[in-house]
Swiss-Prot record:
Binding residue positions for ATP: I657, G658, A659, G660, E661, F662, G663, E664, V665, K683
Enzyme Commission number(s) of this protein: 2.7.10.1
Biological processes per GO annotation: axon guidance; ephrin receptor signaling pathway; hippocampus development; regulation of actin cytoskeleton organization; regulation of GTPase activity
Glycosylation sites noted in the Swiss-Prot or TrEMBL record: N240, N275, N345, N399, N412, N437
A GO cellular-component term linked to this record: plasma membrane
UniProt keyword terms in alphabetical order: ATP-binding, Cell membrane, Cell projection, Glycoprotein, Kinase, Membrane, Neurogenesis, Nucleotide-binding, Phosphoprotein, Receptor, Repeat, Signal, Transferase, Transmembrane, Transmembrane helix, Tyrosine-protein kinase
GO molecular function, one term: transmembrane-ephrin receptor activity
Residue stretches making up the Fibronectin type-III domain: 333-443, 444-538
Name by which UniProt lists this protein: Ephrin type-A receptor 5
Keyword 4Fe-4S set for record: no
Lineage: Eukaryota, Metazoa, Chordata, Craniata, Vertebrata
Motif PDZ-binding, chain ranges: 1011-1013
Annotated organism of origin: Gallus gallus
C-alpha cells in the first residue's frame, strides 16, 4: 500500500493502493472481546460517518464497499511535498454514556519517508490525536486550541514501494486510554502535519466485566475503573431460590476480568444447583438443608407430592423420630418377640426369646419386661412389687434374655416380653409382646441383708444379724463363713441356729471378712454381701478401749494429709491445678462451668492452660470448642461421636494416589442412600494393624469430624465395622499445595497467590477460634482443589521432641523438619496458636517461592542456630514488600508480638481490595545479601571456572555471556544480583531462579549476611 509522492498529485492514491487498503480493512474486521463495549466502530457504520476534514484538500475519504456491499470508510492524506501542513479530521459527536473512561483503537498505514524521493525535508512519520468533551452533540465550532491532545501517534511499521510490489500490508494498531471523562460525550480529531497516512478504522470503546454467575451469585455488568491498576470489589446477589452462605464478592480488574471470588450462595432447602441456577426439587424428591448437595429421592416408606419439599411424609403406619435425619427411611414398631422359653429355679426365672421377625426397619430394637403376679383361684393378676429384681434390667434390654430374682415361692407369674424401637411411642395400635406363664418352686431363703458387730477383742469378734427378708420357710440354721482379709482361700465355717455368734482365735489388729447364709428344707440360700471387721491391737484390753486404735489411726492420717496439703500449697501447684479449697471457691464463683468425672491440668503459662477431661468435657454457652479425643477412656466413643459411620458397600475405590505409615491413600467414589455419587479420598488401614495403630488412625477422624469450614478438609465419614478400616474425606483434585506450586512455577498472578494464602489463614483462624493447635502447618499439609481453594489437612498425630542432634519432632508418621516450627516450640515444647502463626509465615514463603524448600539444604541444627540468633529467611523472588513484611511479623521471636490469625485474614483482605499495594516489590538487589548461613554449602572454591559452575547447574548456555561481561572468576560471579542477570539477558524466570539459588549456596563463604530482626 502507498501514497503517490514526488511531483504528482500529492493526495492521490497509488495504483492498486485502494484495493490493498480494502483488503486490509476486511482482514481487520475482527469481533471485539466480550469485555469491550463499542461506542463507535467506523468499520460497522453503514451510512455516512459525518466526519469533517479541513482544509478540504487535506484528509480525503475513500469510499468503497465489501463483498456484501457494506461501505468501508477510509481516510487518507499525503501532503508530503508541501511545508507547514496542518490538516484536521474531526469525528462526529460520540456519546460516552456517562462512562468514566474510554479507549481508542486506531488502525492505519504510514509511508516510510525515506521511500519518497524529494520529500525528506517536509515528510513526517507521525500524526496527532486530540479530543474535546462536550454535552452538545451539535457543536462543531471548536477551535483548535480547545482540543486536548491525547498523544502523538507513530507507526511501529511503515511501508515502502517494495512492500507494494510484494503486496505486503503493514497495518499498525495503536490503543490509547482517556479518563476520567465528565461530560456526556466527546469529539475526536486527527491532525496531519505532513505524513503520508491512511486511517483504516477508528474504534472507541470502554471495558467492563461482563455479567456472570459464580458460586450461585449473580454479578452484574461492571464498568472497569479509570485507574488501570484498580480492582473494583463487587458484591454478588444470590440467584433465585438461594441463600447466602458467606457474602459473595468478586473483583473486577481493569482488563475486564473477574478475579478473586470470595464467599458463595447455596440453594435453599427444596432446591438444588443445576447449571448455575437453583432448580426446584420435583415431587418424590426433597432437600432438607441448604448445605445438602442436591435433591434426594424420598427414602423408603415416605413420599412427597409437592415441589420444593424439604422433607418427606411417612406412609400410613410408618413413623419418624424427631432425632431421625430426613434422609432416613420411615420405620414402624417391631413385631412381637418369638419363641419365648422359661427356666424356673426356685424363686428365680430365666427367660429367653428370639428377636422379632420384623424389626420395623430400625436397629434400635430393645425389650421391656412386664411382670404380673396372678391368683390361681380367681385368675386375676396384679403388677409385681418392687422387690422383684431384673438382671441385667427391666427396660431397654438389648440382649434376648433376662433373669427375674427374688420372686415369691409357690406363686403364679405371667411375664410379657415386649419389643420396642424408636417409633413405638408414636404407634397408637396394640402392644406387640409374647407372654410366658410360670409357677415358682419351694425356695431357699433370701440372703441376710444386715450384720451388726458386737464385742471386739484382740482375739475375737462378736456378730448378730436379722432373719432374711424372705425366709421362704422355717430357718433351720445359719452358716457363717469368715477369713482374714486377702486370705480368701483359707476360710473357717461356723454353724449356728441363733442369729448371733462369736468368732474366736483371731489375730490381734487384723481385718476379717464375714459372710452369712440361711438354710431351710429347700436348701441353703445365697451368702450375704461381705462385711469387714477388725480385731483390737495387742494394747486394747476391752471393748471400751477398742476405739483408741481408730482415734490413733485417724489422727495419724489427718497429720499426713495436712502435711501433704501444706507442701502442695507451698509448691504453688495448688494454684496452678485448681485443687483443694481454691477449686471449691472457683466452683462457687463460676457455677456455669460443669465438670464431669474430674480433670487434671499440667502446669503451664496462663494462655496455654488446657483441661484434660476423663470421659467428659466442659461446656461453655454459645462457644464451640475443640474436644481432644484422647481424653475419652474409650477412643471408639470419640470416633462414633464425631464421625459418621459409612457402609463399606457405599464406597468404590478406583486407584491408589499415595501411601503413608498406616496404609494406602486412594481416590474413589461415595454413593450414599438418596444422594448422588461423588468423588472422595480414602485412607485405608493396612492389614495386620495393632489396636494402638487403629486408635491412632481413627484419632485423626475424631479430630477432623469436629470441624466444618470451607478451608478445612471435610470428613465424609469412617468405616470401622468392616475391614479395611477407612477414613473418607472430600477429594482435592490438585493434591498437596507444595507439589502443585512446583508443577505450576510462575503460572499464577500475585492476586491468585494471595487468594490461596487468604484461604489458609481463614481455615487457621477457625481452628484457633475452636482452641485447636495444628502443630504441623506446612504447604505439604495444605490440599488444593480444581478451583484453587486451599484447605488445611493432617490432624492425626501427636508429636514428641526427641533428644537427637537433628532436633526434629517425631510422630508416628515420621520426622517433621523443624524448619516450620516456632523457636519456643523447639526449645520448650510450647505449642500455641502463636506457634501456628510462625508456621503460617513459612507457608507464605513456600507459596510465594512456588514450593521452594525453606532454608534450602541447611541442616536442622543450622536452622535452629540461625533462627535463635535472630536471622530469618530472605524474601522470595518478586515478592511484594507487604507480604514479606507480614512474613517477618509472623516470625517475631516474642510470640505475643505475632499477629493473630483474624488479623492476618484482615490484612490479606485489604491487600486484595487494594492490589496496587502489591506492586511494590522487595528490593531485588538486597536478596542475595540477605541469605541464611547454609550447612556445608557449595562454595565458590568448589569450581575451577565460571564455565564449570554453569555446566554443573545445567546453565552452560550462558558461559559466553558471563565471560563477555567481565564475570571471569568465581569471586566476581558471587556478587551477581538479580538485576545483573536481567541485564545480562537471562530473561527466563526458571533460569534466573536456578542461577540465584546456586549463588545463594556459594554466598555463605563470601557473604556472612542474613536478615536479622
Amino acid at each position: 500500500m502507498g501514497l503517490r509522492g514526488g511531483g504528482g498529485r500529492a493526495g492521490g492514491p497509488a495504483p492498486g493502493w485502494t484495493c490493498l487498503l480494502l483488503c486490509a480493512a476486511l482482514r481487520s474486521l475482527l469481533a471485539s472481546p466480550g469485555s469491550e463495549v463499542n461506542l463507535l466502530d467506523s468499520r460497522t457504520v453503514m451510512g455516512d460517518l459525518g466526519w469533517i476534514a479541513y482544509p478540504k484538500n487535506g484528509w480525503e475519504e475513500i469510499g468503497e464497499v465489501d463483498e456484501n456491499y457494506a461501505p468501508i470508510h477510509t481516510y487518507q492524506v499525503c501532503k508530503v511535498m508541501e511545508q507547514n501542513q496542518n490538516n484536521w479530521l474531526l469525528t462526529s459527536w460520540i456519546s460516552n454514556e456517562g462512562r468514566p473512561a474510554s479507549s481508542f483503537e486506531l488502525k492505519f498505514t504510514l509511508r516510510d519517508c525515506n521511500s519518497l524521493p524529494g520529500g525528506l525535508g517536509t515528510c513526517k512519520e507521525t500524526f496527532n490525536m486530540y479530543y474535546f468533551e462536550s454535552d452538545d452533540e451539535d457543536g462543531r465550532n471548536i477551535r483548535e486550541n480547545q482540543y486536548i491532545k491525547i498523544d502523538t501517534i507513530a507507526a511501529d511499521e511503515s511501508f515502502t514501494e517494495l512492500d507494494l510490489g510484494d503486496r505486503v500490508m503493514k497495518l499498525n494498531t495503536e490503543v490509547r486510554d482517556v479518563g476520567p471523562l465528565t461530560k456526556k460525550g466527546f469529539y475526536l480529531a486527527f491532525q496531519d502535519v505532513g505524513a503520508c497516512i491512511a486511517l483504516v478504522s477508528v474504534r472507541v470503546y470502554y471495558k467492563k466485566c461482563p455479567s456472570v454467575i459464580r458460586n450461585l451469585a449473580r454479578f452484574p455488568d461492571t464498568i472497569t475503573g479509570a485507574d488501570s491498576s484498580q480492582l473494583l470489589e463487587v458484591s454478588g446477589v444470590c440467584v433465585n431460590h438461594s441463600v447466602t452462605d458467606e457474602a459473595p464478592k468478586m473483583h473486577c480488574s481493569a482488563e475486564g476480568e473477574w478475579l478473586v471470588p470470595i464467599g458463595k450462595c447455596l440453594c435453599k432447602a427444596g432446591y438444588e444447583e443445576k447449571n448455575n441456577t437453583c432448580q426446584v426439587c420435583r415431587p418424590g424428591f426433597f432437600k432438607a438443608s441448604p448445605h445438602s448437595p442436591s435433591c434426594s429421592k424420598c427414602p423408603p416408606h415416605s413420599y412427597t407430592l409437592d415441589e420444593a419439599s424439604t422433607s418427606c411424609l411417612c406412609e400410613e403406619h410408618y413413623f419418624r423420630r424427631e432425632s431421625d435425619p430426613p434422609t432416613m427411611a420411615c420405620t414402624r414398631p417391631p413385631s412381637a418377640p418369638r419363641s419365648a422359653i422359661s427356666n424356673v429355679n426356685e424363686t428365680s426365672v430365666f427367660l429367653e426369646w428370639i428377636p422379632p421377625a420384623d424389626t420395623g426397619g430400625r436397629k434400635d430394637v430393645s425389650y421391656y419386661i412386664a411382670c404380673k403376679k396372678c391368683n390361681s383361684h380367681s385368675g386375676l393378676c396384679e403388677a409385681c412389687g418392687s422387690h422383684v429384681r431384673y438382671l441385667p434390667q427391666q427396660t431397654g434390654l438389648k440382649n434376648t434374655s433376662v433373669m427375674m430374682v427374688d420372686l415369691l415361692a409357690h406363686t403364679n407369674y405371667t411375664f410379657e416380653i415386649e419389643a420396642v424401637n424408636g417409633v413405638s411411642d408414636q404407634n397408637p395400635g396394640a402392644r406387640q409382646f409374647v407372654s410366658v406363664n410360670v409357677t415358682t418352686n419351694q425356695a431357699a431363703p433370701s440372703p441376710v441383708s444386715s450384720v451388726k458387730k458386737g464385742k471386739i477383742t484382740k482375739n475375737s469378734i462378736s456378730l448378730s444379724w436379722q432373719e432374711p427378708d424372705r425366709p421362704n420357710g422355717i430357718i433351720l440354721e445359719y452358716e457363717i463363713k469368715y477369713f482374714e482379709k486377702d486370705q480368701e482361700t483359707s476360710y473357717t465355717i461356723i454353724k449356728s441356729k441363733e442369729t448371733a455368734i462369736t468368732a474366736d482365735g483371731l489375730k490381734p489388729g487384723s481385718a476379717y471378712v464375714f459372710q452369712i447364709r440361711a438354710r431351710t428344707a429347700a436348701g441353703y440360700g445365697g451368702f450375704s454381701r461381705r462385711f469387714e471387721f477388725e480385731t483390737s491391737p495387742v494394747l486394747a484390753a476391752s471393748s471400751d478401749q477398742s476405739q483408741i486404735p481408730i482415734i490413733v489411726v485417724s489422727v495419724t492420717v489427718g497429720v499426713i494429709l495436712l502435711a501433704v496439703v501444706i507442701g502442695f500449697l507451698l509448691s504453688g501447684s495448688c494454684c496452678d491445678h485448681g485443687c483443694g479449697w481454691a477449686s471449691s471457691l472457683r466452683a462457687v464463683a463460676y457455677p456455669s462451668l460443669i465438670w464431669r468425672c474430674g480433670y487434671s491440668k499440667a502446669k503451664q503459662d496462663p494462655e496455654e492452660e488446657k483441661m484434660h477431661f476423663h470421659n467428659g468435657h466442659i461446656k461453655l454457652p454459645g462457644v464451640r470448642t475443640y474436644i481432644d479425643p484422647h481424653t475419652y477412656e474409650d477412643p471408639n466413643q470419640a470416633v462414633h461421636e464425631f464421625a459418621k459411620e459409612i457402609e463399606a458397600s457405599c464406597i468404590t475405590i478406583e486407584r491408589v494416589i499415595g501411601a503413608g505409615e498406616f496404609g494406602e491413600v486412594c481416590s474413589g467414589r461415595l454413593k450414599l442412600q438418596g444422594k448422588r455419587e461423588f468423588p472422595v479420598a480414602i485412607k485405608t488401614l493396612k492389614v495386620g494393624y495393632t489396636e494402638k495403630q487403629r486408635r491412632d488412625f481413627l484419632g485423626e477422624a475424631s479430630i477432623m469430624g469436629q470441624f466444618d469450614h470451607p478451608n478445612i478438609i471435610h470428613l465424609e465419614g469412617v468405616v470401622t465395622k468392616s475391614k479395611p478400616v477407612m477414613i473418607v474425606t472430600e477429594y482435592m483434585e490438585n493434591g498437596s499445595l507444595d507439589t502443585f506450586l512446583k508443577k505450576n512455577d510462575g503460572q499464577f498472578t500475585v492476586i491468585q497467590l494471595v487468594g490461596m494464602l487468604r484461604g489458609i489463614a481463614s481455615g487457621m483462624k477457625y481452628l484457633s477460634d475452636m482452641g485447636y493447635v495444628h502443630r504441623d502447618l506446612a504447604a505439604r499439609n495444605i490440599l488444593i482443589n480444581s478451583n484453587l481453594v486451599c484447605k488445611v489437612s493432617d490432624f492425626g498425630l501427636s508429636r514428641v521432641l526427641e533428644d537427637d542432634p537433628e532436633a526434629a519432632y517425631t510422630t508416628r508418621g515420621g520426622k517433621i523438619p523443624i524448619r516450620w516450627t516456632a523457636p519456643e516450640a523447639i526449645a520448650f515444647r510450647k505449642f500455641t496458636s502463636a506457634s501456628d502463626v510462625w508456621s503460617y509465615g513459612i507457608v507464605m514463603w513456600e507459596v510465594m517461592s512456588y514450593g521452594e524448600r525453606p532454608y534450602w539444604e541447611m541442616t536442622n541444627q543450622d536452622v535452629i542456630k540461625a533462627v535463635e540468633e535472630g536471622y530469618r529467611l530472605p524474601s522470595p523472588m518478586d515478592c511484594p514488600a507487604a507480604l514479606y513484611q507480614l512474613m517477618l511479623d509472623c516470625w517475631q521471636k516474642d510470640r505475643n508480638s505475632r499477629p493473630k490469625f483474624d488479623e492476618i485474614v484482615s490484612m490479606l483482605d485489604k491487600l486484595i481490595r487494594n492490589p496496587s499495594s502489591l506492586k511494590t516489590l522487595v528490593n531485588a538487589s538486597s536478596r542475595v545479601s540477605n541469605l541464611l548461613v547454609e550447612h556445608s554449602p557449595v562454595g565458590s572454591g568448589a569450581y575451577r571456572s565460571v564455565g564449570e559452575w554453569l555446566e554443573a547447574i545445567k546453565m552452560g548456555r550462558y558461559t559466553e555471556i558471563f565471560m563477555e561481561n567481565g564475570y571471569s572468576s568465581m569471586d566476581s560471579v558471587a556478587q551477581v544480583t538479580l538485576e545483573d542477570l536481567r541485564r545480562l539477558g537471562v530473561t527466563l524466570v526458571g533460569h534466573q531462579k536456578k542461577i540465584m539459588n546456586s549463588l545463594q549456596e556459594m554466598k555463605v563463604q563470601l557473604v556472612n549476611g542474613m536478615v536479622p530482626l
